[in-house]
């Protein structure tokens, strides 16, 4: 899978952009605040219909205009697919795939797969569980539309249950109806998350040993708010919901379920969130991202597009070497301030684009 070309109109600081990419490595070079990341963001947006940087779509629209437009031509399984997205200031968006309207966001997932690695990803390891859940949900949704459906339904029922809890006066028979629905969707979500974590562990073990020259072992552990040991998740979840009714009533929210789960990362049996160095935390997220590349290829038969947003300068030599060795069969779009650190690792298949003030100064030159 690869992006053949990108077309933008009134997208952030790009009034108009049309750029042809190579199937291999594409490097966008320029100073800060010139628009390099905006290009990666537009590619990411076509996979998920959302930005990795903001939840407010209106921020994507050039301030002098009322709409922004993104168009990608994608090569996938020897066929071309075209994604067109119009973004409006009122928060609405119109999406088409091969000129056919996409009515629901879930219909977009799986059309185009990406994995992004940016400096902000360090927060996944260091900060709130919601960031780790979001990462799992995004990765699973893009390879399994049914996962996204179950997640949407779960959150809908969860919201209705919480409204009922906040009312403080309700029949437990009505609550039972919500609990049965929640357990059905939660069972699917948890099973797919566990499968994904198992795959991350399989590929991650190999990747992490290579990055660290065999000095470290990595392990990802899913932390579930419900007992998983006897294999009867639905029964265990229903019991836990009943046990927590009083607490949930007092707080006006549901205290257990996939929306409260988390995962931990251990290096040599040490929790990296609490005790890991910044280097180990970086390596953990790097391992997870590259394991995701392998998983997506296993499921879809093709590597996704890899987006590297100004991360190479943040990495030591071993990590940098691992990335640049590993991307030879993967279309990769890199942003950086300079190519001095890349010259020794990249070949003549690489295209370099110089970016300045929302413009591409050249249409790709070989390194």
Curated annotation (Swiss-Prot):
GO molecular function (one): single-stranded DNA binding
Location in or out of the cell: Cytoplasm
One GO BP annotation of this record: double-strand break repair
GO cellular component entries: cytoplasm
Keywords: ATP-binding, Cytoplasm, DNA damage, DNA repair, DNA replication, DNA-binding, Nucleotide-binding, SOS response
PROSITE patterns: RECF_2 (PS00618)
PANTHER family: DNA REPLICATION AND REPAIR PROTEIN RECF
Role noted for this protein: The RecF protein is involved in DNA metabolism; it is required for DNA replication and normal SOS inducibility. RecF binds preferentially to single-stranded, linear DNA. It also seems to bind ATP.
Family the entry assigns: Belongs to the RecF family.
Protein name (Swiss-Prot/TrEMBL): DNA replication and repair protein RecF
Organism: Clostridium beijerinckii (strain ATCC 51743 / NCIMB 8052)
